[in-house]
């Protein structure tokens, strides 16, 4: 008998949530849009874990009417209320990340009816980040409280956040005729100034970080150019196309993974790195052997020849892949970012690119300073004739150095494919900036290239919002011209006796 009773109670316990789900669903389907909105507001103010499946079905548009094949039709207002109700229910989740996301959603959409529930959740919340997010959501609602002391506390809390939404709320509170209490208005003005100051700091840091990521691409492009230009004195106008070929090599590797190893698609950028390096290095060495070697000492002919080669490479890519941009997707481990400030997110792909660029710089320095090839390159750079007299195969060194520079540019193309569009004209956007980096940093100087690349990248990103991209580039170019007139050797000059 006890066993039978236990089974009966267990069956009732299992059926109760299903009955509640069915009852809420029937009430919602039977109601008109106005009544449905009231139901959603009630559910948001009084969350019930048994109702989350119903709200999830509504959110995904999977709730159908009995006897009909079509799904329930919802207007935009109802969809917004469904999102708010879902956020309220997700505050009951055990996962702190889910609660944090829900609290951030409620900062934008919470209704006054949810005030009591949010207050209860805030009192029992142990996670610091979720607690802070809930405090902000609660403060947004308390701005319309009848008690001036509550409004004053809410205004002061908003001033500590530095959130863009807080600025909007405070600006609304300071509209004529909105807030009658003088103390609250004064506190709102102070808090608004604090929020604007914090937002400005976040914007400046964001621009600096974007500049560093742009500088990383310029560094990878200019690093190879510094080697070839510093060693051979060749103005290679096709160097930007090595970036483009590296990006298209990444695209081809992605296609191969999609077709033959879709289960390992997340790792395609790691395979694309050596592929892009060897493809562009081989093309660079072939270019040096067939064209540039016969034009040494004739800079104008070299410039025109490499410019023509760049046009040929662009047209070849258009014939093979089409004139439109191709899609290179970020793997999951390069998607998303780190939330540093309310208005500052550092994307993972840009963080990885900056670290990768610095890693390539270290490898290049080791190659040039700790290997026999590097010794030969530095010898030929300082005095080609004397190096040849000492037995250094200058022709072979020229070819390998040109291939190394082109390969590094190919690595830059892999990095660029993760943050920008990949198209036939990709390299044209970076060739001028790459030459500016080389000239500003000092021909053949790695340290100068690093400083110049990051400096130009950050300056570009800071000036763009202020005076526009075109005027920003003009101003930077003018400043570089003035600098070169005063210091023609750039930031760092080559040490030793260099023969021009």
Predicted regions: what is each one?
Residues 263-309, 316, 451-456, 487:
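Alpha-helical transmembrane segments within multi-pass membrane transporters and channels
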Residues 269-274, 399-414, 418-480:
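Transmembrane alpha-helical segments in multi-pass inner-membrane proteins
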Residues 295, 301, 305, 325-327, ...:
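Cytosolic-side transmembrane-helix boundaries in multi-pass membrane proteins
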């Amino acid at each position: 008998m006890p066993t039978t009773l236990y089974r009966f109670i267990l069956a009732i316990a299992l059926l109760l949530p299903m009955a509640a789900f069915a009852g809420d669903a029937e009430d919602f389907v039977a109601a008109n849009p106005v009544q449905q909105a009231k139901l959603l507001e009630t559910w948001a103010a009084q969350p019930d874990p048994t109702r989350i499946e119903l709200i999830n079905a509504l959110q995904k548009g999977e709730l159908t009417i009995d006897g009909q094949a079509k799904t329930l039709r919802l207007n935009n207002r109802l969809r917004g209320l469904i999102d708010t109700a879902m956020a309220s229910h997700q505050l009951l989740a055990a996962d702190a990340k889910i609660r944090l996301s829900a609290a951030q959603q409620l900062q934008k959409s919470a209704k006054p009816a949810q005030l009591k529930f949010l207050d209860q959740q805030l009192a029992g919340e142990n996670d610091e980040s979720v607690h802070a997010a809930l405090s902000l959501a609660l403060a947004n609602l308390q701005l319309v409280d009848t008690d001036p002391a509550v409004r004053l506390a809410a205004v002061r809390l908003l001033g500590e956040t530095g959130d863009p939404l807080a600025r909007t709320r405070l600006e609304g509170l300071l509209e004529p005729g909105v807030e009658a209490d003088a103390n609250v208005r004064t506190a709102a003005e102070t808090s608004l100034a604090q929020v604007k100051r914090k937002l400005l700091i976040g914007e400046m840091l964001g621009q600096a970080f974007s500049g560093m990521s742009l500088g990383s691409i310029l560094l990878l492009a200019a690093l190879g150019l510094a080697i070839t230009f510093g060693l051979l004195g060749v103005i290679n106008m096709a160097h930007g196309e090595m970036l483009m070929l590296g990006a298209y090599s990444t695209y081809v590797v992605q296609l191969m993974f999609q077709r033959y190893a879709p289960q390992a698609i997340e790792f395609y950028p790691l395979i694309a790195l050596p592929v892009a390096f060897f493809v562009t290095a081989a093309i660079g060495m072939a270019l040096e052997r067939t064209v540039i070697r016969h034009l040494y000492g004739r800079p104008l002919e070299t410039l025109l020849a490499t410019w023509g080669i760049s046009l040929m490479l662009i047209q070849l890519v258009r014939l093979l892949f089409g004139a439109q941009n191709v899609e290179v997707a970020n793997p999951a481990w390069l998607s998303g970012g780190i939330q540093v400030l309310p208005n500052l997110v550092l994307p993972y792909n840009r963080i990885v690119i900056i670290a990768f660029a610095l890693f390539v710089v270290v490898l290049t320095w080791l190659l040039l300073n700790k290997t026999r090839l590097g010794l030969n390159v530095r010898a030929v750079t300082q005095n080609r004739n004397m190096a040849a007299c000492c037995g250094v195969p200058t022709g072979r060194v020229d070819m390998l150095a040109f291939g190394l520079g082109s390969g590094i540019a190919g690595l830059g193309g892999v990095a660029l494919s993760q943050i920008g569009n990949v198209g036939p004209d990709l390299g044209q956007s970076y060739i001028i900036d790459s030459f500016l980096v080389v000239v500003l940093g000092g021909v053949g100087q790695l340290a100068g290239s690093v400083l110049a690349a990051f400096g130009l990248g950050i300056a570009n990103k800071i000036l763009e919002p202020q005076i526009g991209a075109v005027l920003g580039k003009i101003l930077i170019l003018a400043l570089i011209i003035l600098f070169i007139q005063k210091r023609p050797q750039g930031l760092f000059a080559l040490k030793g006796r260099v023969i021009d």
